[in-house]
Amino acid sequence: MRKKPIIIGVTGGSGGGKTSVSRAILSNFPDQKITMIEHDSYYKDQSHLTFEERVKTNYDHPLAFDTNLMIEQLNELIEGRPVDIPVYDYTKHTRSDRTIRQEPQDVIIVEGILVLEDQRLRDLMDIKLFVDTDDDIRIIRRIKRDMEERDRSLDSIIEQYTEVVKPMYHQFIEPTKRYADIVIPEGVSNIVAIDLINTKVASILNEAK
């Protein structure tokens, strides 16, 4: 019988350090079959909308994601079958024509702002993490990321943060903290928490051998 992969959910607010925590886990297991799948890859296709309409999309609301597809593909990976993960184009605000082939792995990190919001996703996870970072730090990181990587203007980032991102965080994301097995204050700089998580993952991997 094929062993079930370990699935780790990593969530928290935008710019909170989720990706850094996920990479810290990835880097600790170089000899294992381990990968990270981002919820952001599953933003819904918006090619049927005009560019002006796409720009107004609330990307921090659960309905912005095709979570059904993510769950379907995770179940395929659990069963040992490869999947083609969608690629989202942030400059065009819609799904790209490209996909990325993902082979089954021993450890799958599922990362995103709302990965603990859907019970069906939570039920697939062995470990659930919430990265808890101060609002001021998160907005600074978001400004830097969106200007450098997503060709956004400062004004548009600040407007989106105050009108959408911050309210959605308190409405949808922060409440999922109660589902977390571990809450990590200050993200990847919390070495003790990262070490505890890596120890737990190593223990599960050893038990599965």
Swiss-Prot record:
ATP binds at residues 12-19. GO terms for cellular component: cytoplasm. The keyword ATP-binding applies. It is found in: Cytoplasm. This is Uridine kinase. Pfam families: PRK. GO terms for molecular function: ATP binding; cytidine kinase activity; uridine kinase activity. Belongs to the uridine kinase family. It comes from the Bacteria. CDD domains: UMPK. One of its GO terms (biological process) is CTP salvage.
